[in-house]
């Protein structure tokens, strides 16, 4: 059976039971493991401090402080000025994106209109060239037809003389017809005049 005594480095004897009792006294526990009044006071003080800390934490969580109000107001002002914090500070706003889309759409329409104008101008030039070509071909065809159907020079002179003869004959016939007309009118006038003279002469004789 071992002894409760031992030697220190300086060959002094010490008692293990006394050392353990002193350690237990420092921790507030008796030698037989029961609580002492000192240990109860220590435990009570520790529990009260923990309760205060918990109640302080609950109070901070449930009621906003002045600091949290300041932080919240600054956050609201910054969101109103710079936009939500979730977006990048260099990202464009919705209005800027709408303006960019509008400018891009306007540029696309202008480019498309210019392209259509160029195409239309090319088509108009092509149509004009085609019409000029058709006109030249038609003139060439008419010229060839005229040369093909052209009369010889002697035939043309004969036809011109014949036309002149026909014109002279027509003029002679017209003169003869006018002469006959004048002759008939003169005879009719003379007959009417003689008739009037006869009637005038017979009228006084009937009264006598």
UniProtKB/Swiss-Prot annotation:
The gene is RTT105. Keywords: Cytoplasm, Nucleus, Transposition. This is Regulator of Ty1 transposition protein 105. Its main location: cytoplasm. Residues 94-105 have a biased composition (Basic and acidic residues). Residues 28-105 are annotated as: Disordered. Involved in regulation of Ty1 transposition. Inhibits Ty1 transposition at a post-transcriptional and pre-integrational stage of the Ty1 retrotransposition cycle. GO terms for molecular function: nuclear import signal receptor activity; protein carrier chaperone. GO terms for cellular component: cytoplasm; nucleus. Disulfide bonds: none annotated. It is found in: Cytoplasm; Nucleus. Present with 259 molecules/cell in log phase SD medium. It comes from Saccharomyces cerevisiae (strain ATCC 204508 / S288c) (Baker's yeast). Residues 33-42 have a biased composition (Polar residues). GO terms for biological process: double-strand break repair via break-induced replication; double-strand break repair via homologous recombination; heterochromatin formation; protein import into nucleus; telomere maintenance; transposable element silencing; transposition. Residues 60-71 have a biased composition (Low complexity).
């Amino acid at each position: 059976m071992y002894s409760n005594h031992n030697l220190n480095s300086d060959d002094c004897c010490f008692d293990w039971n006394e050392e353990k009792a002193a350690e237990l006294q420092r921790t507030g526990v008796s030698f037989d493991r029961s609580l002492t009044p000192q240990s109860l006071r220590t435990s009570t003080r520790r529990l009260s401090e923990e309760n205060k800390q918990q109640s302080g934490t609950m109070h901070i969580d449930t009621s906003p402080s002045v600091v949290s109000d300041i932080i919240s107001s600054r956050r609201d002002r910054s969101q109103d000025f710079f936009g939500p914090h979730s977006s990048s500070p260099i990202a464009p706003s919705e209005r800027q994106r709408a303006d960019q889309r509008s400018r891009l759409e306007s540029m696309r329409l202008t480019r498309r209109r210019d392209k259509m104008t160029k195409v239309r101008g090319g088509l108009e030039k092509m149509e004009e060239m085609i019409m000029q070509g058709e006109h030249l071909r038609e003139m060439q065809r008419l010229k060839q037809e005229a040369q093909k159907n052209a009369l010889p020079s002697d035939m043309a002179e004969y036809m011109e003389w014949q036309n002149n003869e026909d014109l002279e004959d027509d003029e002679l016939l017209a003169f003869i017809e006018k002469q006959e007309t004048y002759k008939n009118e003169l005879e009719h006038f003379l007959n009417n005049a003689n008739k009037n003279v006869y009637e005038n002469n017979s009228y006084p004789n009937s009264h006598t």
